[in-house]
């Protein structure tokens, strides 16, 4: 189908509202994307007419809710081209997915003297769990350094990998710089050294198709709320053989086969042994609607539109005096910047007065801020519902702030 941004915008109720007396220009989708009516309605319909606890229930509502939940698992597996739906675990989001891997696979496979490799551009969610794991077991955390243009110093990889490397944990797309990392070569190199690879896909899956089989990564994780779905739900993909070997992380209902006070507990098979307790079934239903929504639009169509919009934005921002942009020319989704010597919070507050929503702060990437020697950045993110006119408003707003503040 032909991509129409006007038709897309009509599906998002919040985009019709005003902020400070001006039409909302929502440029903060990298933090959390807005939700189309199709997602809102699907979740509301489930709670109105179809809600029940899933699994084990013999009554109709429970059986139907279970079927709907498992159908979303199947849809998500097709979305990332997994071999099987049973390679996907429902998690609260990217952060929980990474922590699950660190506490299940990591505790079982990383030992004192081993090392894990991350990069200098990672979100805290792909730093802190590995720091905690390394501290627990006495392993080393190694870091791929950055180039000033926001790309990684890939030439250092050969010196970082050795026979003690157990994992490469790498972002697919930087949440600050928009850098898309060249995963294919990195994954091949990691596997040549016997290491597993976890990919943080939180900032990638909404921008273009992702094929986990083609990537050949061992773990891939993403959140629903950045993909126009609900909060509190995400997907962890793990290669099936690897997933079946992993011990459970959390204990409780739904993840057991048998429980005995005298003989202990046995686990059900994966992925269900990683889904203890009552799941966020409504969120799962909403995620399914979000996956269907972007799939119908076509991720290739979305990618083409967003690429054109990004090129336009970068071109227009060249007209803003004293504007510092961070990241490479070829980027996905986000534009991080500072205006002169003004603090990002001040710039963001002025933009909010103009009805423009951007993110300000360290963006859960403090090591990246330290590399650029700044306390914070502004970040405008471009999604499939953003327009050239909204880019123009951002540029005009920054020009106005420059005139006001100098």
Swiss-Prot record:
An annotated Gene Ontology molecular function: pyridoxal phosphate binding
Disulfides per UniProt: none
Catalyses which reaction(s): (sulfur carrier)-H + L-cysteine = (sulfur carrier)-SH + L-alanine; L-selenocysteine + AH2 = hydrogenselenide + L-alanine + A + H(+)
GO cellular component, one term: cytoplasm
InterPro entries: Aminotrans_V_dom, Aminotrans_V_PyrdxlP_BS, Cys_dSase_SufS, PyrdxlP-dep_Trfase, PyrdxlP-dep_Trfase_major, PyrdxlP-dep_Trfase_small
Main localization of the protein described in the UniProt heading: cytoplasm
The keyword Protein transport is assigned to this record: no
Domain of life: Bacteria
Subcellular location: Cytoplasm
Active site (UniProt): 364 (cysteine persulfide intermediate)
Cofactor: pyridoxal 5'-phosphate
Pathway(s) where this gene product acts: Cofactor biosynthesis; iron-sulfur cluster biosynthesis
An annotated GO BP: cysteine metabolic process
Subunit structure: Homodimer. Interacts with SufE and the SufBCD complex composed of SufB, SufC and SufD. The interaction with SufE is required to mediate the direct transfer of the sulfur atom from the S-sulfanylcysteine.
Family: Belongs to the class-V pyridoxal-phosphate-dependent aminotransferase family. Csd subfamily.
NCBIfam families the record matches: PRK09295.1, sufS
This protein's name: Cysteine desulfurase
Source organism of this protein record: Shigella boydii serotype 18 (strain CDC 3083-94 / BS512)
Phylogenetic placement of the source organism: Bacteria, Pseudomonadati, Pseudomonadota, Gammaproteobacteria, Enterobacterales
Annotated gene: sufS
């Amino acid at each position: 189908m032909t991509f129409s941004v006007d038709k897309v915008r009509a599906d998002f109720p919040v985009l019709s509202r005003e902020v400070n007396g001006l039409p909302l220009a929502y440029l903060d989708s990298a933090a959390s994307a807005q939700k189309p009516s199709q997602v809102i309605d699907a979740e509301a319909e489930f709670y109105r007419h179809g809600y029940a606890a899933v699994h084990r229930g013999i009554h109709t509502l429970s059986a139907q809710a279970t079927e709907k939940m498992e159908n979303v698992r199947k849809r998500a597996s097709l979305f990332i081209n997994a071999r099987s739906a049973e390679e996907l675990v429902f998690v609260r989001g990217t952060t929980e997915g990474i922590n699950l891997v660190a506490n299940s696979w990591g505790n079982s496979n990383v030992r004192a003297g081993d090392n894990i490799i991350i990069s200098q551009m990672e979100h805290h969610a792909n730093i802190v769990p590995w720091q905690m794991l390394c501290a627990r077991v006495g392993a080393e955390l190694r870091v791929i350094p950055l180039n000033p243009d926001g790309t990684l110093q890939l030439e250092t990889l050969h010196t970082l990998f050795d026979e003690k490397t157990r994992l490469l944990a790498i972002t697919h797309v930087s949440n600050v710089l928009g850098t898309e990392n060249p995963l294919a070569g990195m994954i091949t190199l990691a596997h040549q050294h016997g290491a597993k690879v976890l990919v943080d896909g939180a900032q990638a899956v909404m921008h273009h198709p992702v094929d986990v089989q083609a990537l050949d990564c061992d773990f891939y994780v993403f959140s629903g709320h950045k993909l126009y779905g609900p909060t509190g739900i995400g997907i962890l993909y793990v290669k099936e053989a690897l997933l079946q070997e992993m011990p459970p992380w959390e204990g409780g209902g739904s993840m057991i086969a048998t429980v005995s006070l005298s003989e202990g507990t046995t686990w059900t098979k994966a992925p269900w042994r990683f889904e203890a307790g009552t799941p966020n079934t409504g969120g799962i239903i909403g995620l399914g609607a979000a996956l269907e929504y972007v799939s119908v639009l076509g991720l290739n169509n979305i990618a083409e539109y967003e690429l054109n919009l990004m090129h336009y934005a970068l071109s227009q921002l060249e007209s803003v005096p004293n504007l510092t942009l961070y990241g490479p020319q070829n980027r996905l989704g986000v534009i991080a910047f500072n205006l002169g010597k003004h603090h990002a919070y001040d710039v963001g507050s002025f933009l909010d007065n103009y009805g423009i929503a951007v993110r300000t702060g360290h963006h859960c990437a403090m090591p990246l801020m330290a590399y650029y020697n700044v306390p914070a950045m502004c970040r405008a993110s471009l999604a499939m519902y953003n327009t050239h006119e909204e880019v123009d408003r951002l540029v005009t707003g920054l020009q106005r702030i420059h005139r006001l503040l100098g």
